[in-house]
Amino acid sequence: MNESFDKDFSNHTPMMQQYLKLKAQHPEILLFYRMGDFYELFYDDAKRASQLLDISLTKRGASAGEPIPMAGIPHHAVENYLAKLVNQGESVAICEQIGDPATSKGPVERKVVRIVTPGTISDEALLQERQDNLLAAIWQDGKGYGYATLDISSGRFRLSEPADRETMAAELQRTNPAELLYAEDFAEMALIEGRRGLRRRPLWEFEIDTARQQLNLQFGTRDLVGFGVENASRGLCAAGCLLQYVKDTQRTSLPHIRSITMERQQDSIIMDAATRRNLEITQNLAGGVENTLAAVLDCTVTPMGSRMLKRWLHMPVRNTDILRERQQTIGALQDTVSELQPVLRQVGDLERILARLALRTARPRDLARMRHAFQQLPELHAQLETVDSAPVQALRKKMGDFAELRDLLERAIIDAPPVLVRDGGVIAPGYHEELDEWRALADGATDYLDRLEIRERERTGLDTLKVGYNAVHGYYIQISRGQSHLAPINYVRRQTLKNAERYIIPELKEYEDKVLTSKGKALALEKQLYDELFDLLLPHLADLQQSANALAELDVLVNLSERAWTLNYTCPTFTDKPGIRITEGRHPVVEQVLNEPFIANPLNLSPQRRMLIITGPNMGGKSTYMRQTALIALLAYIGSYVPAQNVEIGPIDRIFTRVGAADDLASGRSTFMVEMTETANILHNATENSLVLMDEIGRGTSTYDGLSLAWACAENLANKIKALTLFATHYFELTQLPEKMEGVANVHLDALEHGDTIAFMHSVQDGAASKSYGLAVAALAGVPKEVIKRARQKLRELESISPNAAATQVDGTQMSLLAAPEETSPAVEALENLDPDSLTPRQALEWIYRLKSLV
């Protein structure tokens, strides 16, 4: 049966009618329908869940004359199954029994109590600890895009207005949302196709007036002027849809979402999707996290610190006041790193605990962890108090103290609480007098049963008599089969066993009712007290969120201080003058994976030297040199120290990389097409303050086409755009550019060749490379010797055809070694076809006149 069923459910059983009505409200997502100790799925949901979760697909009787496909999961294991579904981009509606089976006529009342979606999860078990989990919404009109993101586990709400497709693609790459909402008429489907968690939403959810109303209602404001987003209509359309979706799925208030922030292009260094991918900031080219910049830099001790560091890496800021403040803090903290990190480690993930508190889904152990975080604050204050740094003291102030809340949680929650409130035993003894009384009654059962057993043995004289309890039959008096005929007349048989009989007496039954009542009352009161704790904590939510943010920032800065000391990084200097000057720069990732010392190299880019033409052998280190420059700039612009002896860096607005390429088969684009698309983006958007890395432009086409394109691109970047450019190439013709235009210089990475072996020096020198060592590299790669030998022969042939291959031509180009030979003269061609032995003297004379006319 398909879920697009007829709304007339009268042919079905009452229970299936209830299920189908609930399912009709959530047709697009899986419905977990609670039945006793299981969540059941029916019809198409069951078939889908069976495939996604690898669980058995069975059948449950029949309804409306058809067998019902069914699959189920145990309620106690639901979080594990939800995690699997969320990771596959699925959403699930959780339907619970809210009625009492004992008093219900017909099916027990059920209700969808929450909807779990990839972008709105807050449960600890479902989240990646050290990664942001974002819900996003995208909107498009004739002027550009609107984009909003929300991290429900922190309340961080952002919007932006990307002007064009490339910028929008870069934002999607940077934020990598777990779930993306888009309008039903969204035109640029190619931009989002293939992304996980796509959700098509009706147009009215993006309506601007509705969005303003929703946002003002959420923030308790009359307008959005105070947030600086009043005129960001496209961004607000996306934000309104996003907020509506969160309210629909969470079905509770969202007090931790207290503001919205506009992200503006001019505030940060812009990196397109290709640049983020090529620089391997948080993900390597294979999709993993090994050997990335984050893998080297992230030794934070809290999950919230790790997430903040990754946000910094993907959004380097251009405000040098902020950057200098971070640098100062990193320097000031160096003497206290070893004392601070063990204490910070104990703080844990306070940010996400607060989100669960706001959503009222925090579990007892969340409150215990919050208490433990509060207990670290006095020690952190004591250590930071001695640090002579204004930014550090500002952070310390934001951390707060929360002594009253710490005291409350120490009094209210036991040291090691159970997982769930319904398990009981969460509220500490002494916190509430009535609860202690009910517990004493329940806990006193053991003493009472011991006294009853002794009394009844003495009264009856039966030495096999025991008093016990089990969950099915409650309290009982047990007598062995051999003595059961001696049981007193007031003993009422309750259960017969193989070797014993079990009885009940009125006194024991009365006590059982009293104990069970006390346990139920204790649990109900405990749940009430637990809910009251939320009411006592939530008024402090804004201050608590500020504290969590300050603690995360402290963790990041302490981590950067430790990394600077451990990895021998230096503090870069910011200048208003354009350019980058690096002394003994190193690649932060490569130097960590090498088994040999890394060769540090200098770099000098300035208004007088804006472009470096980089030549040298394959594997010589050109790409490493280029990438390390971009990574050093990136680290400088998050406020970090950098891997170099000395760095002076001017304003940078964008970083572009055109490094390597692969076929984009899904979009039907060849390697060369991908390369040219990325190149076009650079030429259209780079400015004189952009850092541009161009590696091997023009490889995917013919020699002359490739050389022409590379020449023209270099010329455009150097003469027109005047960007800070590193231009690596194997076209030696380009080494003539410095002679033809200002601001261009040659550098090369050298190698030494000895016989069939080659040694790469990895050292950057001024001037052009003398040769490319292509055959030596091929031999090193294991190309068969006979192929290398034949290649050398062919190379000699080509060089003999064009002996002046390295000479500069008048038109500014240079003959490639593989270029076609010069066009043969008609006289030479005639002589080649001539057989002198067959000529008569008269014919020979005629040939002389003919050749004369051809010259």
Curated annotation (Swiss-Prot):
<dbReference type="InterPro" id="IPR016151">
    <property type="entry name" value="DNA_mismatch_repair_MutS_N"/>
</dbReference>
<dbReference type="Pfam" id="PF05188">
    <property type="entry name" value="MutS_II"/>
</dbReference>
<dbReference type="InterPro" id="IPR005748">
    <property type="entry name" value="DNA_mismatch_repair_MutS"/>
</dbReference>
<dbReference type="InterPro" id="IPR045076">
    <property type="entry name" value="MutS"/>
</dbReference>
<dbReference type="Pfam" id="PF05190">
    <property type="entry name" value="MutS_IV"/>
</dbReference>
<dbReference type="InterPro" id="IPR027417">
    <property type="entry name" value="P-loop_NTPase"/>
</dbReference>
<dbReference type="GO" id="GO:0005524">
    <property type="term" value="F:ATP binding"/>
</dbReference>
<dbReference type="InterPro" id="IPR000432">
    <property type="entry name" value="DNA_mismatch_repair_MutS_C"/>
</dbReference>
<dbReference type="GO" id="GO:0005829">
    <property type="term" value="C:cytosol"/>
</dbReference>
<dbReference type="InterPro" id="IPR036678">
    <property type="entry name" value="MutS_con_dom_sf"/>
</dbReference>
<protein>
    <recommendedName>
        <fullName>DNA mismatch repair protein MutS</fullName>
    </recommendedName>
</protein>
<keyword id="KW-0547">Nucleotide-binding</keyword>
<comment type="function">
    <text>This protein is involved in the repair of mismatches in DNA. It is possible that it carries out the mismatch recognition step. This protein has a weak ATPase activity.</text>
</comment>
<dbReference type="GO" id="GO:0003684">
    <property type="term" value="F:damaged DNA binding"/>
</dbReference>
<dbReference type="InterPro" id="IPR036187">
    <property type="entry name" value="DNA_mismatch_repair_MutS_sf"/>
</dbReference>
<dbReference type="InterPro" id="IPR007695">
    <property type="entry name" value="DNA_mismatch_repair_MutS-lik_N"/>
</dbReference>
<dbReference type="Pfam" id="PF01624">
    <property type="entry name" value="MutS_I"/>
</dbReference>
<dbReference type="GO" id="GO:0006298">
    <property type="term" value="P:mismatch repair"/>
</dbReference>
<dbReference type="Pfam" id="PF00488">
    <property type="entry name" value="MutS_V"/>
</dbReference>
<keyword id="KW-0227">DNA damage</keyword>
<dbReference type="InterPro" id="IPR007696">
    <property type="entry name" value="DNA_mismatch_repair_MutS_core"/>
</dbReference>
<dbReference type="Pfam" id="PF05192">
    <property type="entry name" value="MutS_III"/>
</dbReference>
<dbReference type="InterPro" id="IPR007861">
    <property type="entry name" value="DNA_mismatch_repair_MutS_clamp"/>
</dbReference>
<keyword id="KW-0067">ATP-binding</keyword>
<keyword id="KW-0234">DNA repair</keyword>
<dbReference type="InterPro" id="IPR017261">
    <property type="entry name" value="DNA_mismatch_repair_MutS/MSH"/>
</dbReference>
<keyword id="KW-0238">DNA-binding</keyword>
<comment type="similarity">
    <text>Belongs to the DNA mismatch repair MutS family.</text>
</comment>
<feature type="binding site">
    <location>
        <begin position="616"/>
        <end position="623"/>
    </location>
    <ligand>
        <name>ATP</name>
    </ligand>
</feature>
<dbReference type="GO" id="GO:0030983">
    <property type="term" value="F:mismatched DNA binding"/>
</dbReference>
<dbReference type="InterPro" id="IPR007860">
    <property type="entry name" value="DNA_mmatch_repair_MutS_con_dom"/>
</dbReference>
<dbReference type="GO" id="GO:0140664">
    <property type="term" value="F:ATP-dependent DNA damage sensor activity"/>
</dbReference>
